[in-house]
Amino acid sequence: MPENVVEVVILPIENLNKALATLAKYSHKTLKPAFSEYKVYIPLRESPGRNVVDFIKQELNAEITWMLPDIFPKRKQIISLKKLEKSVGVPIPKSATLVGDILLVNKLPEAAQGREYEIGKVLLKNFGVRAVFLKVEKFNGIQRVASWHKLAGWGDTFTVHRENGCWFSLDISKVFFNPRLSNERLVIAERVERDEFVVDMFAGVGPFAILIKKLSGAQVCAIDINKHAVEFMKLNSKLNKVSISILEGDARLKIAEVGYEASRIIMNYPERSIEFIDSAISVLRSYGFIHVYVFSRVDELESLVHRIEDIVQSHDRKIINLSSRVIEEVSPRRYIYCIDLQVL
């Protein structure tokens, strides 16, 4: 074995599950797999036998090489950002988001100018990630994607995120993904019964749809207008060994193609979800549920609820149960709310 390097298995992301199972007893104890360019890089603590090597090369399309251990995500204790700034003496962002093996920073402090790389290296080491990216252009358009600049680390914006027992492959430069909704996705998934038909109107890479299918076994139809999200959703269905119906296009039009009356509709598009309620109501069965996600200040929520009630009533339907929940604070005094409706 060469000095100061680790043996690494590199293979296509679609073979992730088989690779992890096959290499479990050989996997490194302190280094985690890395993801880049639609491939997984699995560091090993010891070489597998000849039979295993032949299997992963022939059946999983793998290659074996040697790489520096420093480039891999680490299994380690993370220091809070507030404590980190005190200990390292460089300006640290107030918040950062872990997605798979990368760290996302929305904004750097003003004092960070000229020290971006230094800050990136500090964050890279503290969080034990493959790369750190800074948002340089806000989410825009109906596809909700942003532009990112790499502060430190290696590889591209592709990663694989583990959440609620599921794998989600994604590219942050091509799709929208919010890991902070992990608990909310579990809350909704645990409400779904096996005999339901669920429509996810803005499904992204499938975190709601795939988890619901995996936990409940219900029929699920997932819609998204972003072609990249649809491709990732198809891959993620395979990674998680579930089968869901996937439609690409404008949810207002595609929802007419679902083929069944929905028992539950998920509308996770906080910027514009209310605009799509007309379309959702048209396929919702009696006593069905709609989960509408909206951005709102506390003092604006009541008017949003009245607006939703008016839309439902315009279709000669009646809301028989309504409640709202705070999901996440997105800026001072502005939140993502989920408005839960049951409609007769």
Question: Where in the sequence are the language-model features?
Answer:
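SAM-dependent transferase fold signal centered on methyltransferase-like domains
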Residues: 1-344
